[in-house]
Amino acid sequence: MAPNLRKSHPLLKMVNNSLIDLPTPPNISAWWNFGSLLGICLTTQILTGLLLAMHYTADTTLAFSSVAHTCRNVQYGWLIRNIHANGASFFFICIYLHIGRGLYYGSYLYKETWNTGILLLLTLMATAFVGYVLPWGQMSFWGATVITNLFSAIPYIGQTIVEWAWGGFSVDNPTLTRFFALHFLLPFMIAGLTLIHLTFLHESGSNNPLGIVSNCDKIPFHPYFSLKDTLGFMLMLLPLTTLALFSPNLLGDPENFTPANPLVTPPHIKPEWYFLFAYAILRSIPNKLGGVLALAASVLILFLSPLLHKSKQRTMAFRPLSQLLFWILIANLFILTWVGSQPVEHPFIIIGQLASLTYFTILLILLPITGALENKMLNY
């Protein structure tokens, strides 16, 4: 009998083991769809980004008008740009839900997968930041100025690092050119990291909602989950196209319709919505270095999740107290996101400070204590 090419060919064999014959727990819910959705987001962003890069000019005098030209004169340029801009938002929605799933169901106990995932998040954040600077509108320019300036809080070498990153003494042409180069490069780095992420995941196999070992009961990925993922793709691409076609500027800042002007500061400098929670934490500390450290900690704290897991059960499925804390944490993140979009004045300052304190308290203190308490209650 002729050998099955899918199982014998060196390249097809890898695809087969990752996407076709992959043994998968039969009870994974729709929360496990977000990994593949992130893959679709990345593919969409790289394709639309490539098409946009063909019409973009990385020069301070031409960047703004080259984006306007793309939207007005290039065939479907407006659509490509709208999908790319809003695709970034969907990318972050998916990655935040994906991380939330990981925290709820204890997926962080696969340490290598979890750590590469956090590196992916950091790379995605860097990509989105440098990408936001490229249209060279007011918020692009001032966002770049404010965020890069944070590095000057690093003692002794800070100012040198900032000027080195800028390529001068302010955000100018060299900054824009290098940000374009980085924005082109980083998505491919994300793609590479994704392969590492998947390699680690396939070492252990997927977690499942019960948090128990499912080696005795697995089903092939195709056709069961390939079909389920296809449904997920449609359910994500539908709102994405709806947003891109009907309300493409809903999530953007009106300030970015004004070309960058170093002499006029916008009344409220704020990042895109997906960075607002971290921005609120940054602003809640009235000291530059302290704020920068809190900003870094707000994301890097995820690295500690495996160490802070004190429960004998893996998931929160059967732990009502931890569930309550988890959902308070989610509500808290919404509050931080809202506060980040408000001006720095009373009552937003105190709300932001309380929400920031609550964020770190829940993750560092309350969740581990609750895990240990639940062990005690269940006589573990």
UniProtKB/Swiss-Prot annotation:
Q: For this UniProt entry, which segments traverse the membrane?
A: 34-54, 78-99, 114-134, 179-199, 227-247, 289-309, 321-341, 348-368
The free-text cofactor remark is: Binds 2 heme b groups non-covalently.
The cofactor named in the record is:
heme b
* Binding locations of heme b b562: 84, 183
Q: Which residues bind a ubiquinone?
A: 202
**Key word Glycoprotein present:** no
Q: How does it sit in the membrane?
A: Multi-pass membrane protein
The residues that the entry says bind heme b b566 are 98, 197
Q: What keywords does the record list, in alphabetical order? A: Electron transport, Heme, Iron, Membrane, Metal-binding, Mitochondrion, Mitochondrion inner membrane, Respiratory chain, Transmembrane, Transmembrane helix, Transport, Ubiquinone
Q: Give GO cellular component annotations, separated by semicolons.
A: mitochondrial inner membrane; respiratory chain complex III
What's this protein's function? Component of the ubiquinol-cytochrome c reductase complex (complex III or cytochrome b-c1 complex) that is part of the mitochondrial respiratory chain. The b-c1 complex mediates electron transfer from ubiquinol to cytochrome c. Contributes to the generation of a proton gradient across the mitochondrial membrane that is then used for ATP synthesis.
Protein location: Mitochondrion inner membrane
Gene Ontology terms for molecular function: metal ion binding; ubiquinol-cytochrome-c reductase activity
On the tree of life, the source organism's domain of life is Eukaryota
Q: Which family does it belong to?
A: Belongs to the cytochrome b family.
Q: What else is known?
A: Heme 1 (or BL or b562) is low-potential and absorbs at about 562 nm, and heme 2 (or BH or b566) is high-potential and absorbs at about 566 nm.
On subunit structure and binding partners, the annotation says: The cytochrome bc1 complex contains 11 subunits: 3 respiratory subunits (MT-CYB, CYC1 and UQCRFS1), 2 core proteins (UQCRC1 and UQCRC2) and 6 low-molecular weight proteins (UQCRH/QCR6, UQCRB/QCR7, UQCRQ/QCR8, UQCR10/QCR9, UQCR11/QCR10 and a cleavage product of UQCRFS1). This cytochrome bc1 complex then forms a dimer.
Where mainly found? Answer: mitochondrion
Q: Which PANTHER family match?
A: CYTOCHROME B
> What is one Gene Ontology biological process annotated in the Swiss-Prot or TrEMBL record?
mitochondrial electron transport, ubiquinol to cytochrome c
Name of the protein described by the UniProt record: Cytochrome b
